[in-house]
């Protein structure tokens, strides 16, 4: 029974992570912080290889 509980917990965590990534998929490649006159921007650059 504990193995089944662990498996269900793992499935719930994975589904939650997938839903979160799906909701914020457009903003995963950039990060922006503004504080007063200072702006910090970090951008992830990647290329798809085929």
Swiss-Prot record:
It holds the Pfam family HOK_GEF. It is a single-pass membrane protein. Keywords: Cell inner membrane, Cell membrane, Membrane, Plasmid, Toxin-antitoxin system, Transmembrane, Transmembrane helix. GO terms for cellular component: plasma membrane. The keyword Nucleotide-binding does not apply. Its main location: membrane. It is found in: Cell inner membrane. Induction: In the presence of rifampicin at 42 degrees Celsius. The chain crosses the membrane at residues 5-25. The keyword Metal-binding does not apply. It comes from the Bacteria. Disulfide bonds: none annotated. Belongs to the Hok/Gef family. When overexpressed kill the cells from the inside by interfering with a vital function in the cell membrane. Toxic component of a type I toxin-antitoxin (TA) system. When expressed is involved in cellular Mg(2+) release and degradation of stable RNA. This is Protein PndA. It comes from Escherichia coli.
């Amino acid at each position: 029974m504990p193995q089944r509980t662990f498996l269900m917990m793992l499935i719930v965590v994975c589904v939650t992570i997938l839903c979160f990534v799906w909701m914020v998929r457009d903003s995963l490649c950039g990060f922006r912080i503004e504080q007063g006159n200072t702006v910090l921007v970090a951008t992830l650059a990647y290329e798809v290889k085929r």
